[in-house]
Design a protein with these regions (language model features):
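Short, well-ordered coil/turn segments that N-cap beta-strands
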Residues: 1, 54-55, 100-104, 128-130, ...
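Non-catalytic, usually N-terminal nucleic-acid engagement modules in DNA/RNA processing proteins
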Residues: 1-97
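Hydrophobic faces of well-ordered beta-strands that scaffold small-molecule active sites
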Residues: 3-6, 57-59, 104-108, 132-134, ...
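Active-site beta-loop-alpha junctions enriched in small/polar residues
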Residues: 8-10, 62, 107-113, 137-139
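Alpha-helical scaffolding segments of alpha/beta enzyme cores, especially the outer helices
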Residues: 44-47, 75-82, 86-89, 115, ...
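Active-site-adjacent beta->alpha loops and helix N-cap segments on the catalytic face
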Residues: 68-73, 140-150
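Alpha/beta enzyme core
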Residues: 86-103, 111-137
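Conserved small/polar residues in nucleotide/adenosyl-binding loops
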Residues: 161-167
Length: 168
């Protein structure tokens, strides 16, 4: 059975009140259990998912609230795309640990702004990965906006033919 692991981007979104700090380096937060400090970076998140042995590994991303203003959403998308480049570099320089293929999926962010979603989708599909995920939806935006963003992303993705199926 295939295993998919999440990078923790959505979990970071839910860490309000834990001293969460989002920077270019990654995300620092305190454990809600014992107060210990932790740092997630694109690189160590890739390493963790490699160690888990997931078949599908999600890129590390920031999941901004659905109600984010345009400037914050644009800044967040820029950060997510820079983190994605670091995820791809780390993933591609490491090998699976358990003798089977693992796949890194970019996550398409952009809140409910069509131009940001379009930019994110174009970037994601340009990386020639086996798939991608649509992130940052169902986080406070109205349902009709969520469906509109899915449509924006799907229009981009179906115009590319980068899906490669493994052969046996």
């Amino acid at each position: 059975r295939p295993i998919l692991t999440d990078s923790g981007g959505f979990q970071v979104f839910s860490l309000t009140g834990t001293g969460r700090k989002i920077t270019e380096e990654g995300v620092t937060f305190r454990s809600h259990i014992d107060g210990s400090k932790h740092l997630f970076t694109p690189e160590n998140v890739m390493d963790i998912q490699r160690q888990i042995g997931a078949d599908i590994v999600m890129a590390f991303d920031e999941c901004p609230p659905g109600t984010s203003d345009y400037n914050y959403a644009r800044h967040s998308l820029g950060l997510t795309q820079r983190w994605l480049e670091r995820c791809v570099a780390r993933f591609d320089e490491t090998a699976p640990l358990y003798g089977y293929e693992q796949n890194l999926f970019p996550i398409v962010q952009g809140c409910t702004y069509r131009d940001l979603r379009k930019k994110a989708a174009e970037h994601a599909v340009s990386l020639n990965r086996a798939g991608y995920a649509i992130g940052g939806l169902a986080v406070g935006e109205p349902a009709e906006e969520m469906y509109a963003m899915i449509e924006v992303v799907n229009r981009i993705s179906v115009s590319y033919t980068h899906l490669t199926l493994p052969t046996t």
